[in-house]
């Protein structure tokens, strides 16, 4: 990280699984997402003094309309890209066939089979959510 980095972003994302499917979303206002369009795992910045676990649970409620009592940390990622990012990657399970209602800044929420995910070019940040899901697959599901 460059010594002159003045922007720091703490972010949580949540891979919501329902059976063999994962939820991806597209946002209405992409300014908070580095102007990126395309599919994302539901995510948001951490609020002041918010624990990452609480952020992941909030994201499930605010963006997918589901309260999830149990989220599990998959891994943490850190990178600089003009701003330093620390990303907490969480996962949670919903019952098979769960219906989601896009809310807040979510324009579209769609379940994708794990064997039929979108092409990287259709996923924000050059397919980053696909890389996160691949890293999660290396662990227990």
Which residues does each PLM region occupy?
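Conserved glycine-rich beta-strand-loop-beta hairpin in the small C-terminal domain of fold type I
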Residues: 40
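Charged phosphate-binding loop/patch that engages nucleotide di/tri-phosphates or the phosphate backbone
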Residues: 127-141
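A conserved beta-turn-beta hairpin within the catalytic core of GNAT-like acetyltransferases
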Residues: 31-37
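Conserved N-terminal beta-strand and adjoining loop/helix that marks the start
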Residues: 1-24, 76
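Short coil/turn motifs at beta-sheet boundaries
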Residues: 7, 34, 81-85
């Amino acid at each position: 990280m460059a010594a002159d980095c003045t922007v720091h972003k703490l972010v949580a994302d949540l891979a919501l699984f329902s059976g063999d499917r994962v939820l991806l979303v597209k946002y209405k206002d992409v300014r908070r997402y580095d102007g990126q369009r395309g599919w994302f795992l539901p995510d948001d910045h951490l609020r002041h003094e918010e624990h990452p676990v609480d952020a992941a649970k909030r994201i499930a409620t605010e963006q997918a309309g589901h309260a999830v009592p149990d989220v599990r940390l998959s891994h943490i990622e850190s990178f600089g890209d003009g701003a330093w990012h620390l990303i907490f990657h969480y996962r949670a399970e919903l019952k098979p066939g769960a219906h989601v209602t896009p809310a807040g800044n979510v324009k579209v929420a769609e379940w994708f089979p794990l064997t039929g995910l979108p092409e990287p070019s259709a996923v924000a940040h050059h397919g980053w959510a696909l890389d996160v899901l691949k890293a999660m697959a290396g662990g227990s599901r």
